[in-house]
Each structure stands twice: as structure tokens, then as C-alpha cells.
């Protein structure tokens, strides 16, 4: 049996967080699911995670600002931003962005396959 890949999942919407974490745990991922941005930042800095997923679920909520803070923290971790609300401006800090309510688990899993293959380290200036 292959070891599971440790990833972080952050979403302020607890129902969406729970459903997404459940689906990801059925795959080869060891998911740390967090609904608090401070805890997410602490886990990102302290843990040996391979990748992080940040989900913005509701338009106009404060979670969007918190996600921007997490993205700007330069955590040297490949990050996938799933902007289901569609109201975050183009974000240059995320390694990959999926926009819109129609983002499916298939899209997220495909993006994770790409990001988990990347090495941890500083992002390029490009």
C-alpha cells in the first residue's frame, strides 16, 4: 500500500469543507481539514505538507480576505485556489486557480495531481 500524500484543505464553509475532505480522503491523500485561517497558516508553516488547497465558497464574505493573507504569506508550498464564489481578483500568489461554481471534484483531483508532483520551495518571480 502506498503512503498517503499529506495535504492541507482550508475552507471557511464547514459543510463544503467536510464534503471535500471526505472525497479527498477516498483518494491517496492524508487530508488536514481546517476552517480557521490562523490555524491553516500555522499548519502550513509547521507541517511537512506536499500541497495546499484553499476554497473560497461564498461571494462577499470575509474568507476571501483571509485567503489573500494566506496566499501572500509565501509559505513555499504549492497552492491550489478554488474560487467557487468567483469574486476573488486574479491571484498571482496561487500556483493554480480554478474559478466558478461548476468546479468539480474531478477538476480538483486533476489539479492536485499536477501540484503534488512539484517540489516545495520559493515561487518563481514570473
Enumerate the language-model features and the residues they cover:
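Two-component/phosphorelay signaling modules centered on CheY-like receiver
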Residues: 14-33
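Short, flexible coil/linker segments at domain boundaries that flank nucleotide/cofactor-interacting
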Residues: 1-4, 74
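Proline-centered loop/turn at the N-terminus of a beta-strand
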Residues: 6, 76-80
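Conserved phosphotransfer microenvironments
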Residues: 37, 54-73, 84-87
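Conserved acidic carboxylate
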Residues: 10-11
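Acidic, metal-coordinating helix/loop segments flanking the phosphotransfer/catalytic sites
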Residues: 35-52
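Output/docking surface of receiver
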Residues: 80-123
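Conserved phosphotransfer cores of two-component systems
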Residues: 45-48, 70-76
